[in-house]
């Protein structure tokens, strides 16, 4: 009976360790993608252009193509 109790405790510790490591990996991925998004947003803000917002001239669009709204990918 003692061996079974020890085995169950070891299994519980291993499972909680695995869950903790998996959670840390997910947080690291979220941080990585957040940093990428923020750096892309800051690039657009620094260049003063918009991806798909309203515009009056081509220079307001990152794509350089304005037709009342920025046309992305042209």
Curated annotation (Swiss-Prot):
<dbReference type="GO" id="GO:0090729">
    <property type="term" value="F:toxin activity"/>
</dbReference>
<protein>
    <recommendedName>
        <fullName>Conotoxin Vc6.8</fullName>
    </recommendedName>
</protein>
<comment type="function">
    <text>Inhibits voltage-gated ion channels.</text>
</comment>
<dbReference type="Pfam" id="PF02950">
    <property type="entry name" value="Conotoxin"/>
</dbReference>
<feature type="disulfide bond">
    <location>
        <begin position="49"/>
        <end position="62"/>
    </location>
</feature>
<dbReference type="InterPro" id="IPR004214">
    <property type="entry name" value="Conotoxin"/>
</dbReference>
<comment type="similarity">
    <text>Belongs to the conotoxin O2 superfamily.</text>
</comment>
<keyword id="KW-0165">Cleavage on pair of basic residues</keyword>
<dbReference type="GO" id="GO:0008200">
    <property type="term" value="F:ion channel inhibitor activity"/>
</dbReference>
<keyword id="KW-1015">Disulfide bond</keyword>
<keyword id="KW-0960">Knottin</keyword>
<keyword id="KW-0964">Secreted</keyword>
<keyword id="KW-0732">Signal</keyword>
<keyword id="KW-0800">Toxin</keyword>
<feature type="signal peptide">
    <location>
        <begin position="1"/>
        <end position="19"/>
    </location>
</feature>
<feature type="propeptide">
    <location>
        <begin position="20"/>
        <end position="34"/>
    </location>
</feature>
<dbReference type="GO" id="GO:0005576">
    <property type="term" value="C:extracellular region"/>
</dbReference>
<feature type="disulfide bond">
    <location>
        <begin position="55"/>
        <end position="66"/>
    </location>
</feature>
<feature type="disulfide bond">
    <location>
        <begin position="61"/>
        <end position="70"/>
    </location>
</feature>
<keyword id="KW-0872">Ion channel impairing toxin</keyword>
